[in-house]
Amino acid sequence: MNNIIDGKALANEILADLKLEIQELTSQTNASPKLAIVLVGDNPASIIYVRHKIKNAHKIGIYTLLINLSATIHTNDLISKINELNLDNEISGIIVQLPLPSSIDKNKILSAVSPSKDIDGFHPLNVGYLHSGISQGFIPCTALGCLAAIKKYEPNLTGKNVVIIGRSNIVGKPLSALLLKENCSVTICHSKTHNLRSITSKADIVVAAIGSPLKLTAEYFNPKSIVIDVGINRISSNKIIGDVDFENVQSKVQYITPVPGGIGPMTIAFLLKNTVKAFKDSLYTLDT
């Protein structure tokens, strides 16, 4: 049954376009985008994610600077390091890899990144732009990846009923803003929602982002459902699964993303797309 939304293939299309765009920009300006990645501590999952980001960046011509810092670093010292990157004109975008150690004030760190280099879209100013409907700044990459995957198979979203399970600042909240802009009717559910199954089973599109392995079984969906699984649940050193019971759900819905190979590659593709946007914005700033 060919109803799998191949996030890897979609991401590769985006990356191919970005590679050509970077080549053209480099030939015109004799400069290239550069991405700074701040990694605090030695969380094994974070190390893997960073490795994927660097690998894909290099493939398309984005230079990277990886800054490894001790998990014992103080919040103020980390802010000082971020400020150095903010002031470095060669750096187009900055990522602070999450999660951070519990001793660090995450909100202070995310607010320290310059909004013009905040390619994750987590700075309060960029969050405000998104939820105010202002077409400026950066939007969180996983939300962008989800929307692109949905629109590939359902280009006209006007009037669609969408249920998002998860209310995080990374996925649930930004995606709800994007879908409202597409004229969807959006319901956000979470761990305290009652009768979740009765809500999701009536939806045209269900986005699962709760971090609960295989939580959503076939009964949560209908035959016309488009299912976007954002869950990344590591069950061993080399195996991850989603929030949706993919094996039993796939044949009972219209379209579904796998884990891995679904939204993960799309997230990286849009992260790099945001990096190129930041690079182009910086060129414009230097010209004015």
UniProtKB/Swiss-Prot annotation:
Entry keyword annotation includes Oxidoreductase: yes
Pathway the protein takes part in: One-carbon metabolism; tetrahydrofolate interconversion
Ligand binding (NADP(+)): 166-168, 191, 232
Catalysed reactions listed for this entry: (6R)-5,10-methylene-5,6,7,8-tetrahydrofolate + NADP(+) = (6R)-5,10-methenyltetrahydrofolate + NADPH; (6R)-5,10-methenyltetrahydrofolate + H2O = (6R)-10-formyltetrahydrofolate + H(+)
GO CC terms of this entry: cytosol
UniProt keyword annotations, A-Z: Amino-acid biosynthesis, Histidine biosynthesis, Hydrolase, Methionine biosynthesis, Multifunctional enzyme, NADP, One-carbon metabolism, Oxidoreductase, Purine biosynthesis
Example GO BP: purine nucleotide biosynthetic process
GO MF annotation terms: methenyltetrahydrofolate cyclohydrolase activity; methylenetetrahydrofolate dehydrogenase (NADP+) activity
Gene3D superfamilies in the cross-refs: Leucine Dehydrogenase, chain A, domain 1, NAD(P)-binding Rossmann-like Domain
InterPro entries the record matches: Aminoacid_DH-like_N_sf, NAD(P)-bd_dom_sf, THF_DH/CycHdrlase, THF_DH/CycHdrlase_cat_dom, THF_DH/CycHdrlase_CS, THF_DH/CycHdrlase_NAD-bd_dom
This enzyme's EC code(s): 1.5.1.5, 3.5.4.9
Family statement drawn from the similarity comment of this UniProt entry: Belongs to the tetrahydrofolate dehydrogenase/cyclohydrolase family.
Function, as annotated: Catalyzes the oxidation of 5,10-methylenetetrahydrofolate to 5,10-methenyltetrahydrofolate and then the hydrolysis of 5,10-methenyltetrahydrofolate to 10-formyltetrahydrofolate.
Oligomer and partners: Homodimer.
Protein name: Bifunctional protein FolD
Native species: Rickettsia africae (strain ESF-5)
Encoding gene (name): folD
